[in-house]
Amino acid sequence: MADFEELRNMVSSFRVSELQVLLGFAGRNKSGRKHDLLMRALHLLKSGCSPAVQIKIRELYRRRYPRTLEGLSDLSTIKSSVFSLDGGSSPVEPDLAVAGIHSLPSTSVTPHSPSSPVGSVLLQDTKPTFEMQQPSPPIPPVHPDVQLKNLPFYDVLDVLIKPTSLVQSSIQRFQEKFFIFALTPQQVREICISRDFLPGGRRDYTVQVQLRLCLAETSCPQEDNYPNSLCIKVNGKLFPLPGYAPPPKNGIEQKRPGRPLNITSLVRLSSAVPNQISISWASEIGKNYSMSVYLVRQLTSAMLLQRLKMKGIRNPDHSRALIKEKLTADPDSEIATTSLRVSLMCPLGKMRLTIPCRAVTCTHLQCFDAALYLQMNEKKPTWICPVCDKKAAYESLILDGLFMEILNDCSDVDEIKFQEDGSWCPMRPKKEAMKVSSQPCTKIESSSVLSKPCSVTVASEASKKKVDVIDLTIESSSDEEEDPPAKRKCIFMSETQSSPTKGVLMYQPSSVRVPSVTSVDPAAIPPSLTDYSVPFHHTPISSMSSDLPGLDFLSLIPVDPQYCPPMFLDSLTSPLTASSTSVTTTSSHESSTHVSSSSSRSETGVITSSGSNIPDIISLD
């Protein structure tokens, strides 16, 4: 009967995982909530379980609670041991070993409080025996077999404190533990030699004392992980922790990013005086943490790159085999890939690769630059492949020999294409041919005679949407022999450098050779010059008489001198034809306008003015 009660208490203390293991061992259903699992296990026990099931229950219980009270026969001994355990007041006992044995916690529990272990033991005297044998909380091992992940930028020189469990010693939420360690003279010498003074009185060390915290799990190498409400003091001085990382979504508690802690600046660099570390944290149900202290040497990205090169370059045949595997036709697939294009630009720096690198775990051929990748992880160690966003640890990096050959063979291309047989060819950009548009457009040419041309096009009513081009710089005889399409007459205004008289309005054929054009419909020419920008209103040309060569029209028109251009027109030297009319004013301080219109001759009229350095050219196309 006593064995039954003992087994019943053991089963009642099991968690869901232990209950599932027990029911699975007995061949019972192990799905459902904890209450259902517990009822099945107790029913299994009452119905008379086999000795093998009883042995399994005791095995699970010993695994669940490795250290429990064997009995309460000597209650006075338990009381005295508990009182002596809780009475420790000094944070560090004098007989502590230097190699990391911690002292008792500074927080104590009142012996007769209802929540204290002693009170619970005293109150159990009048209760049944199975209630007195309730197990105590599990105590994790002092030095668990915890392995931390290697840090590529640090070489471990020595272990100062082996991984030690942060044991919960009371029922209070906030716990505190103390650890001590000492440095040897050789370790102190190495730290002092590596010291570098920075601006502002700061000091930097390449040989560092490094504190690491992680979960006390032995299943796999652990990453750095901090408990909640962590507070670290080194030799009584508060150590600044990294800032909180932004939460992934609202409603989740912020956590600090896990990383090793460099406590060298707070360590006593002496072999005669030990160093003390105080760690306080908030306990969590189901989570135990471990701490350790190491002496490490910090490395740079250049050192890691040199080590990566010393590992050697991977044979190009491995990459060719991977290419053939990717381009091998799948008989079940309707789409077959016959070629594979790969860029020679680094996805990190957007520049040409210099040291092509990728991880062995990656399935893609695209490489990234090893130097840039190491520099990026030196600033913020993430070790994520920039191509596929998967883990790419330093230990899995390789230098691709095939890409090394490609980069050495062609230095002027940024992309290549792999064929099915593993060969490759460069992908050079195609030069687009310059195509001349079939639709004509207005063309402006500058020459020695025309310094600043400006063309104005007047279209006829018959072809308002059609725009023709007149090239004023063509001097070859081939243009004269061919009959170009019909063009309209143009009037050019240019500055004559060798004019014998200054300020004279002259009409002369242009020295620029132009194609012959046909006459323009008179209806297309405006009857007056009011459409053009002139500083005064004038009389229509048709109403002027050709026998008035010396009449000054400006004296008859009231004009404000400040709006007149500074042109001095003295004489008129141009032949008059039957269909053209010329009006010349010879005022020395006034302005005049010369208009030439011809319907029977294909020539250009040039109005020359030396009063301004910038000529105005009007092309009527």
Curated annotation (Swiss-Prot):
InterPro entries: PINIT, PINIT_sf, SAP_dom, SAP_dom_sf, Znf_MIZ, Znf_RING/FYVE/PHD. Changing C362 to S/A: Loss of MDM2 and TP53 sumoylation and of autosumoylation; no loss of JUN- and TP53-binding. SUPFAM superfamilies: SAP domain. A zinc finger (SP-RING-type) spans 331-412. Changing L472A: Abolishes binding to SUMO1. Zn(2+) binds at C362, H364, C385, C388. Residues 11-45 form the SAP domain. A motif (Nuclear localization signal) lies at residues 484-492. Residues 579-610 have a biased composition (Low complexity). Keywords: DNA-binding, Isopeptide bond, Metal-binding, Nucleus, Phosphoprotein, Transcription, Transcription regulation, Transferase, Ubl conjugation, Ubl conjugation pathway, Zinc, Zinc-finger. CDD domains: SP-RING_PIAS2. The modification Phosphoserine is found at S476, S477, S478, S499. The keyword Transcription regulation applies. Residues 579-621 are annotated as: Disordered. Sumoylated. Residues 134-299 form the PINIT domain. Residues 467-473 are annotated as: SUMO1-binding. There is a cross-link at K46, K249, K430, K435, K443, K452, K489, K502 (Glycyl lysine isopeptide (Lys-Gly) (interchain with G-Cter in SUMO2)). It is found in: Nucleus speckle; Nucleus, PML body; Nucleus. Functions as an E3-type small ubiquitin-like modifier (SUMO) ligase, stabilizing the interaction between UBE2I and the substrate, and as a SUMO-tethering factor. Plays a crucial role as a transcriptional coregulator in various cellular pathways, including the STAT pathway, the p53 pathway and the steroid hormone signaling pathway. The effects of this transcriptional coregulation, transactivation or silencing may vary depending upon the biological context and the PIAS2 isoform studied. However, it seems to be mostly involved in gene silencing. Binds SUMO1 and UBE2I. Interacts with AXIN1, JUN, MDM2, PARK7, TP53 and TP73 isoform alpha, but not TP73 isoform beta. Interacts with STAT4 following IL12 and IFN-alpha stimulation of T-cells. Interacts also with GTF2I, GTF2IRD1, IKFZ1, DAB2 and MSX2, as well as with several steroid receptors, including ESR1, ESR2, NR3C1, PGR, AR, and with NCOA2. Sumoylation of a target protein seems to enhance the interaction. Binds to sumoylated ELK1. Binds DNA, such as CDKN1A promoter, in a sequence-specific manner. Interacts with PLAG1. Belongs to the PIAS family. This is E3 SUMO-protein ligase PIAS2. It comes from Homo sapiens.
